[in-house]
Amino acid sequence: GYIGASSIAGAQSYGVYAYMKHFALNDQQINQSKLLCTWADEQAIREIYLRPFEISAKVGGCKAVMSSWNYIGNQWAGACNALLNGVLRGEWGFRGMVITDGFHFTDYMDSDIAIRNGCDLMLKNYDVATNHLTDTTSATSVKAMRQACKNIMYTVVNSRVYDPANTVSTPIWRTAMIVVNVLLAVLLVVLEVLTFKSYKKNCLLYTSD
């Protein structure tokens, strides 16, 4: 936990938001996206599985969390209200955004359910059937989307994204080159017009002779 807290704090000192993952009870990689169910009692969960995350959240001050594919008992960790809102935000005081692990072609990973239970972002580099909201008009969905946006923006604005050092201004030499190129282009057009007029005039003189 303290290793994770130090890594997160170090990254955040440079304006990087580091994802604490995989939250939680992600105890095996084999078949991890195939409805893997991890069973444990509350004492084991709190004292063994959650303790490193708790230290990373409280001591490291993390502002971004990635949930896991697995189920905790019979509930997907990425849409577990007791875990994401109850423990993470409620008990530990976490402020920031939660993103899913990578969306696969699995029916149980549903964004409409996830966003209502404390998950803010769905991780996928291309569109699948369930990684976007299908309900965007109901009162519960609008409320959940508003909260998710707030969580995401809180994380982003507390990173280096809006640091003045990121502002990129055009170097003087580049501005000078642009001006020179424009002037040369104008000069080239003028010369072409004059050349054409001279050629046309010479043609008329030759014809009259």
What are the language-model segments listed below?
Residues 1-208:
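Glycoside hydrolase catalytic-domain context in secreted enzymes
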